[in-house]
């Protein structure tokens, strides 16, 4: 996980442009690294590994003299490190109630940024073969929709985002036959594919 975080911080500004920008804007990168170190520490100890890891990370962070706020954030990240992946893949992220509930969990955009980056790097480290554009898209959509909610911005429906992107693609094509062919392909996919 740490290796992926470091690489995302230095490289990957093409494949992970948004994430590269986010990781380099974090107020305290060490919080992300410590959450990455502790997120699976509770595995094999009997019980919920997220809860065990959260308690362990909180104790450690206090012991090394981190502020209570930083210690709480690390512990919260460890406790919730599976939430974003689970919600993005198992719930309907186009449902405003899903976004509202997740926004209540994360509370603010800073926590959201940290959790999003931890989630992506955890999935990529666990099994790189499981990481794909579809999962990335779901996570990114959940992130962007939740960020809009937390910033009190109007949340654009996925259908509207999808239509805008399709129109941009159509505008770049020259021939009518290309547009017709592409239109038939677009009908094979739901709106979430284009968001």
Which positions does each model-derived feature cover?
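Acidic/histidine-rich catalytic neighborhood
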Residues: 62-63, 67-119
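Regulatory modules associated with amino-acid/nitrogen control
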Residues: 97, 101-195
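Acidic/His-rich, divalent-metal-binding segments that scaffold phosphate/diphosphate chemistry
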Residues: 2-50, 65
């Amino acid at each position: 996980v740490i290796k992926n975080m470091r690489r995302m911080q230095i490289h990957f500004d093409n494949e992970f442009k948004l994430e590269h920008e986010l990781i380099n804007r974090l107020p305290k990168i060490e919080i992300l690294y410590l959450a990455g170190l502790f997120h699976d520490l509770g595995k094999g100890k009997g019980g919920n590994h997220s809860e065990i890891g959260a308690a362990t990370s909180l104790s450690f962070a206090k012991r090394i003299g981190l502020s209570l706020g930083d210690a709480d954030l690390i512990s919260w990240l460890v406790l919730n490190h599976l939430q974003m992946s689970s919600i993005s893949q198992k719930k309907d992220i186009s449902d405003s109630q899903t976004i509202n509930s997740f926004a209540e969990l994360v509370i603010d955009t800073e926590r959201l940024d940290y959790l999003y980056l931890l989630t992506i790097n955890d999935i990529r480290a666990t099994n790189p073969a499981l990481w794909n554009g579809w999962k990335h898209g779901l996570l990114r959509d959940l992130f962007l929709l939740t960020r809009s909610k937390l910033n009190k911005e109007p949340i654009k429906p996925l259908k509207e985002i999808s239509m805008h992107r399709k129109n941009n693609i159509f505008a770049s094509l020259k021939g009518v036959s290309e547009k017709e062919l592409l239109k038939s392909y677009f009908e094979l996919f739901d709106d979430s594919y284009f968001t």
